[in-house]
Amino acid sequence: GFGALFKFL
């Protein structure tokens, strides 16, 4: 999911 991506940001 994109949630994990935002976690990195």
UniProtKB/Swiss-Prot annotation:
Tree of life domain: Eukaryota
GO cellular component: extracellular region
Expression (tissue specificity): Expressed by the venom gland.
Intracellular or extracellular location(s): Secreted
Keyword terms: Secreted, Toxin
Family stated for the protein in its record: Belongs to the cationic peptide 04 (cupiennin) family. 03 subfamily.
Protein name: Short cationic peptide-1f
Organism listed in the record: Cupiennius salei (American wandering spider)
Record lineage: Eukaryota, Metazoa, Ecdysozoa, Arthropoda, Chelicerata
